[in-house]
Regions:
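An anionic, glycine-rich sequence signature occurring as long contiguous blocks
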Residues: 2-5, 9-11, 25-36, 268-396, ...
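Dynamic "connector" segments at or just before major functional cores
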Residues: 2-219, 226-239, 261, 462-501
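Short, conserved catalytic/metal-binding motifs centered on acidic residues
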Residues: 60, 91-92, 106, 124-126, ...
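Secondary-structure capping and boundary motifs in well-ordered enzyme cores
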Residues: 82-87, 194-196, 415-423, 452
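Short amphipathic alpha-helical "interface-anchor" segments enriched in bulky aromatics
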Residues: 106, 381-420, 424, 428-435
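An acidic- and aromatic-residue-enriched active-site/binding cleft used to recognize and process polar
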Residues: 111-112, 175, 205, 215-216, ...
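Domain-level cores of phosphate- or acyl-group-handling catalytic modules
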Residues: 220-276
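C-terminal structured "cap/appendage" subdomains that terminate the fold
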Residues: 434-477
Length: 501
């Protein structure tokens, strides 16, 4: 970082710290927010944008070779008058980085001359043109777009330290992408009565990247055609990571494929509590069951405080609602060979001792079983359960795809067109992860990977800038400040110095 830039940051930091320093205030006669004589003026010389971080994002995308990769692999336009395929894809993704939630929001950027100058564009596609672009996709085109993203993803991975490649954990799950539309092709009613599409999502736990997203009719079961996408995910990671894990719920316990997956990876899947498994668990002697002790949610580092009243629990008791309370949990393991497998696998049984309550009355006790099947022989039964439960974090990734980048808003009128938009919108989520992986600050790297998309926008994208076009460059002159700017500049310099091959 240049000395001048460092001095400016240090000065701004000192000023805001001085302003926010705790003071012994006297009683104030007026509210703190007392601005009244407010005027607006138009600056005739300078042009600015609110999302100044888009320059660093665009440079990273360009340096990674992603733009050339799209134009070489995805062919939807016979002639480029004037846009290329990469222009459309990035325009849709950058709309999300500018806070857009719908195709119509593109028009705001299109009318902003400073935004166009910031990206070096004469003009960008309008919302109607983008809708037409999405309708041009076939299933093969969407798959090729995902593979193009994955090739760029691998180049970003290749810049990581050796420790990054010790283990890859792939989370697999399905979700319903609801829509209020009535004329969208491919939509159907799901198992829970919602109209929309059934989406398969495969992501990597460490980086939260969406590796594959598959759009299907709303009545499709979660596991439909999932085996081929799991195979593609294994192809993506197996050559780079020393150990690969698959993790999913009972819907993805596809025993027909276990023997094949066993040769390439470790896996832990939930498995339905069928009568044969329950009978095996019941036949195991009580002395073989081991207690499952859950880890505390947090560790008290100072002084333990008195817990506040549990309002939810009090209301449940007062109104006589039925409540299921866990009394104890025990685990045991045994070998089991599913009918469609040639190999024998390890099953961990979790037995929950429950009490069914209504108000202050304990109605009866109940025993429920949960089963997990794995090809790993090293973890303890308790660790298998903990590992399987960590899959719940995948729900947070799906929530961010739904409400962070709005990838499942379904703006088009066709299943494949909506699939294409889903993949492109998820590209914004993936770019966030790539930016985090290229951040020199190791602590901040982890924070970015765990950040919600909204916070990432507010921290690294929503940086007000003047846009100045010179003869050979585009200058983003920052006029705002936050305490992440030092790391922002370090990451920008790291991106400029990287050479992708």
């Amino acid at each position: 970082m240049k000395k001048v830039k460092h001095k400016v940051l240090a000065r701004r930091k000192r000023k805001i710290e001085k302003r926010l320093r705790r003071k012994n205030w006297t009683n104030q006669p007026k509210p703190m927010l007392k601005a009244s004589n407010i005027h607006y003026q138009m600056d005739g010389r300078h042009k600015g944008i609110a999302y100044g971080g888009i320059g660093a994002i665009h440079l990273m995308v360009k340096r990674s070779g992603f733009i050339k990769e799209i134009d070489n692999a995805v062919h939807l336009l016979k002639r480029h008058l004037p846009y290329h395929e990469s222009d459309h894809v990035l325009n849709l993704a950058y709309n999300i980085f500018a806070g857009g939630t719908r195709l119509q929001d593109i028009e705001l950027q299109r009318q902003d001359e400073a935004w166009l100058d910031a990206l070096g564009a004469e003009v960008i596609p309008d919302p109607t043109t983008e809708g037409d672009f999405l309708r041009r996709f076939s299933e093969d085109d969407v798959i090729e777009l995902m593979e193009t993203i994955n090739r760029t993803r691998q180049r970003v991975w290749d810049k990581q330290p050796k420790s990054f490649f010790e283990k890859a954990i792939l989370n697999i799950d399905g979700t319903i992408a609801e829509t209020t539309g009535e004329c969208k092709k491919g939509m159907d009613i799901s198992y829970n009565g919602l109209w929309g599409y059934s989406t398969l999502a495969i992501s990597m736990a460490q980086t939260r990247e969406a590796l594959y997203l598959v759009n299907r009719p709303g009545n499709a079961p979660s596991h439909l055609d999932s085996a081929q996408w799991i195979d593609r995910s294994l192809d993506l990671v197996c050559d780079r990571f020393k150990q690969v894990w698959l993790r999913g719920d009972t819907d993805f316990s596809l025993t027909k494929h276990f023997d094949r997956w066993d040769e390439r990876s470790k896996f832990v899947f939930g498995i339905d509590a069928r009568q044969n498994l329950i009978a095996i668990a019941d036949s195991i002697a009580e002395r073989q069951w081991e207690p499952l002790l859950r880890k505390p949610r947090y560790e008290v580092k100072t002084k333990k405080r008195k817990r506040p009243e549990n309002v939810k629990e009090r209301i449940v008791k007062e109104r006589g609602f039925e409540n299921i309370r866990t009394v104890s949990e025990h685990v045991v393991e045994f070998d089991y060979r599913p009918v469609k497998c040639k190999k024998t696998y390890r099953v961990v049984a979790l037995r929950k001792n429950l009490t069914i309550e209504k108000g202050d009355l304990a109605l009866f006790d109940d025993i429920r079983y949960f089963f997990y099947i794995t090809n790993d022989r090293l973890m303890t039964p308790q660790e298998v359960v903990y590992f399987a439960n960590e899959r719940c974090d995948h729900e947070n990734d799906i929530e961010q795809l739904k409400n962070g980048v709005n990838a499942m808003r379904m703006p088009a009128d066709d299943l494949v067109a909506n699939w294409a938009y889903m993949v492109i919108a998820a590209l914004a989520w993936n770019i966030k992860a790539w930016y985090g992986l290229l951040t020199p600050n190791k602590v901040l790297r982890y924070q970015i990977l765990r950040m919600e998309f909204k916070r990432f926008l507010n921290t690294f994208l929503r940086i007000p800038c003047h846009i100045i076009k010179t003869g050979r460059s585009i200058v983003y002159r920052l006029v705002g400040y936050n305490h992440y700017l030092k790391d922002f500049f370090r990451t920008f310099q790291a991106i400029k110095a990287l050479g992708f091959t």
